[in-house]
Amino acid sequence: MLMTAAADVTRRSPRRVFRDRREAGRVLAELLAAYRDQPDVIVLGLARGGLPVAWEVAAALHAPLDAFVVRKLGAPGHDEFAVGALASGGRVVVNDDVVRGLRITPQQLRDIAEREGRELLRRESAYRGERPPTDITGKTVIVVDDGLATGASMFAAVQALRDAQPAQIVIAVPAAPESTCREFAGLVDDVVCATMPTPFLAVGESFWDFRQVTDEEVRRLLATPTAGPSLRRPAASTAADVLRRVAIDAPGGVPTHEVLAELVGDARIVLIGESSHGTHEFYQARAAMTQWLIEEKGFGAVAAEADWPDAYRVNRYVRGLGEDTNADEALSGFERFPAWMWRNTVVRDFVEWLRTRNQRYESGALRQAGFYGLDLYSLHRSIQEVISYLDKVDPRAAARARARYACFDHACADDGQAYGFAAAFGAGPSCEREAVEQLVDVQRNALAYARQDGLLAEDELFYAQQNAQTVRDAEVYYRAMFSGRVTSWNLRDQHMAQTLGSLLTHLDRHLDAPPARIVVWAHNSHVGDARATEVWADGQLTLGQIVRERYGDESRSIGFSTYTGTVTAASEWGGIAQRKAVRPALHGSVEELFHQTADSFLVSARLSRDAEAPLDVVRLGRAIGVVYLPATERQSHYLHVRPADQFDAMIHIDQTRALEPLEVTSRWIAGENPETYPTGL
């Protein structure tokens, strides 16, 4: 089954973020931009591994660089296991608990310290020659390493540096456990941890290239100046200059048909994202591109990040079936928060267009284009839809389904989260067996049900089968919600991928012409490839990644971005829809780079090789979901991404406006008061 297989692949695969130490240093430098051009800043790299990282930081900040030598004190017979550290100046830090636990004698500890002390002096002489260490008294010292594990070496460095009485001590590393970063936050003036992988296995797991740094490389880096007017490098503007030459005009976020045709090619699956769930231009441009793909390229379905039964009600409407008389009614099934995500003016107009377009074809025929959902939040609604279907075709099977699904009645009605909590913590039964049995029962009788009424019956059977699959996957998902964020996220995206695959198979079965082609509508966080983002280090996967692995060149992904404007979002989960001001993008972000490039454009390394270099750099990328928290924007809405690998193309619209819900509240109309933003005072 896809879920198990994908989970196994995730555990076996390396979870890298940075190409090498130099790239990690460039990422850190962007996060340390506040220290740029400050005359009292000195960058110290912990030798040897921290020097390539530190050189990039120092060069970007236009600050002097020096090496600080720290030697790990390894346990007897196990040199790689640190029991402490020795820093320049003779400062020794020892983990007393480890020393006692390993029964290391004082004499053994002295022998280890003396041996490492000799190596420390040798390295200082090799790196610096006769030159004395840089005077850091009264200075702001940024201490850089290639990562932290236990933090013993960094702790020894901090203790030794304090003796020199610097004005401030700042620690900056590309990767470290969250617990270690928090520990140092209480010891120094500032801590910058670019990534905090969970679980944290080793520093080297965050790098594709983690080869050992040599003494010669350290000497070469120290001999290469990092400060001085002639050395200042406008890296971001240079990247923007390159992008200006290759950016393709896309008014309103919509490229020309020729550009879109070249980008899509013969792909069967085109995933079109959004960097927020509440931006009008993202929805409008996506709808316009989808209309052209349906009309001119034979795409036969939209598969959205929406619940299966609610989306299928829309599918019936656009095919001229069901009882709804207009698009507003067809979308009324979307009642769960956030309703505006699909109950909005853009989706309403698209649904009405799709119904009008489909009327040119025979009602119910698969030459019509459909509208489907990929998500799994519809636990109880899907249960009701399975039973409703079986009541019509097999009353005895419906009775069996009622008996099995009664297991879910122990939790609050329509509350999958309450079921998950009860099952996870033993406060209620797990309904896993019942959900699986019912899915098997529906699948076992599928052929008999399909023969009862031809093609239309087979469509409804497929609908029922997917509802049963959704119940089974939602049951697992809601239990997993209370065991970890990554686990539940992966289950959700694996379910989306499974549903997409089943939909392709279903549509293929009835096409005489070329294979079925589907447009996917979902957030960038699902559409993009997780392997090109820092969440990959946590073991997280995405729909876009799974689709690429399964379908290769038969798939394309398009991401959206914006620099500023307004967005429809809530301030908390389940909250009211608000029209909120979007802050200008952070320094060092993809959005800032695009802001420096043009107003509305498409850029793709597939269409222009020159676009690859500026996009093949780790930068911050913004992701606004249904909740937007400007006060904690860096922590809540940004992650490190490599755009060249995350998407096949990106479309940037510099200033955007909030998506209009069908049910507009007075608070949404009022928006935010710019005079009091963001303090609210």
UniProtKB/Swiss-Prot annotation:
CDD domains: Ere-like, PRTases_typeI
Ranges annotated as spanning the membrane: none
Name of the protein this chain belongs to: Uncharacterized protein Rv2030c
Family under the similarity heading: In the N-terminal section; belongs to the purine/pyrimidine phosphoribosyltransferase family.
Cross-referenced InterPro entries: Emycin_Estase, Hydrolase/PRTase-associated, PRibTrfase_dom, PRTase-like
Keywords: Transferase
Regulation: induction: A member of the dormancy regulon. Induced in response to reduced oxygen tension (hypoxia), low levels of nitric oxide (NO) and carbon monoxide (CO). It is hoped that this regulon will give insight into the latent, or dormant phase of infection.
One MF annotation (Gene Ontology) recorded for this entry: transferase activity
Cellular component, GO annotation: cytosol; peptidoglycan-based cell wall; plasma membrane
Lineage: Bacteria, Bacillati, Actinomycetota, Actinomycetes, Mycobacteriales
Keyword Transferase: yes
GO BP terms, alphabetized: response to antibiotic
